[in-house]
């Protein structure tokens, strides 16, 4: 099916459910800042796609975040694909740096931390995150696509297990209970790796 160049925006019910839940339990305002940081992240991808001449088909807001279709990238050079895949994390990193430069502004510090966390999280080579796509792209320069996909899956699974084990060890060693947000992060890592 030929793409007509118009961006379709889809809102899944799960997006509204998660946003409502997060706003209900969040008294700090970090949930709203996280949503803004996610929009900035996807905006980075959209800007890079426009610069590289790619028209995205669809952006979907769902319970796990925001997903942007990156179809049409197959015909691009590896360098352009790398720019597009890295653009979201780059925007979050730049916003974090700008926020941390604003000394004495607590909201800016929280927004900077949220952007840094989203940058790091998306850079992980796990599942369908940007880091996994970058890893696969880099690996295909040395091995076949099939081998690159297998290596990506192994690295993603190992890293997800290490992160989950680290959370468990931290909680046991420090006598801490797992917070609801940490539980959802671990659950999201598992889901991302299983879906990919």
Residue positions per predicted region:
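Hydrophobic transmembrane alpha-helices and their immediate loop junctions
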Residues: 1-196
């Amino acid at each position: 099916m030929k793409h007509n160049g118009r961006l379709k925006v889809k809102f899944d019910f799960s997006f509204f459910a998660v946003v409502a839940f997060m706003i209900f339990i969040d008294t700090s305002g970090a949930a709203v800042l996280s949503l803004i940081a996610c929009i900035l992240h996807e905006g980075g991808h959209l800007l890079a796609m426009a610069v590289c001449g790619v028209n995205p088909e669809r952006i979907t807001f769902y319970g796990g975040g925001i997903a942007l279709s990156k179809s049409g990238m197959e015909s691009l050079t590896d360098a352009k694909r790398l720019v597009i895949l890295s653009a979201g994390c780059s925007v979050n990193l730049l916003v974090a740096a700008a926020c941390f430069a604003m000394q004495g502004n607590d909201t800016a510090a929280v927004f900077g931390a949220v952007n840094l966390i989203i940058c790091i999280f998306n850079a992980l080579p796990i599942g369908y995150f940007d880091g996994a796509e970058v890893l696969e792209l880099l690996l295909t320069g040395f091995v076949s696509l099939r081998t690159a996909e297998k290596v990506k899956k192994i690295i993603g699974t190992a890293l997800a297990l290490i992160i989950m084990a680290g959370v468990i060890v931290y909680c046991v060693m420090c006598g801490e209970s797992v917070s609801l947000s940490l539980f959802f992060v671990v659950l999201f890592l598992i889901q991302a790796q299983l879906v990919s």
